[in-house]
């Protein structure tokens, strides 16, 4: 049995989010939350929120044991890019691309033995 949580259109670059998500893949939920709280990156807040949501989904919707949960899958997909322009000298303008991400975390119960 597995429980899943997603956050879509998060205003964080997918590259920066993947850097953080790679640290927690395959880890126990408690260990992953500890890593996220001690990592000084901007992407940790939304990722922590998704991990907690997946944990709550597992407990409430599937009656899984919260102590035996681990992150079986977690990945970041690229969302749409918000395109903006910054005015520059001599009537020019340069583009600013604000990237978004879709975060997905899947948790499973660890088998005893």
Swiss-Prot record:
Keywords: Ribonucleoprotein, Ribosomal protein, RNA-binding, rRNA-binding. One of its GO terms (molecular function) is structural constituent of ribosome. PROSITE patterns: RIBOSOMAL_L22. InterPro entries: Ribosomal_uL22, Ribosomal_uL22_bac/chlpt-type, Ribosomal_uL22_bac/org-type, Ribosomal_uL22_CS, Ribosomal_uL22_sf. GO terms for biological process: translation. It comes from the Bacteria. GO terms for cellular component: cytosolic large ribosomal subunit. CDD domains: Ribosomal_L22 (cd00336). HAMAP family: Ribosomal_uL22_B. This protein binds specifically to 23S rRNA; its binding is stimulated by other ribosomal proteins, e.g. L4, L17, and L20. It is important during the early stages of 50S assembly. It makes multiple contacts with different domains of the 23S rRNA in the assembled 50S subunit and ribosome. Belongs to the universal ribosomal protein uL22 family. Part of the 50S ribosomal subunit. This is Large ribosomal subunit protein uL22. The lineage of its organism: Bacteria, Bacillati, Bacillota, Clostridia, Natranaerobiales.
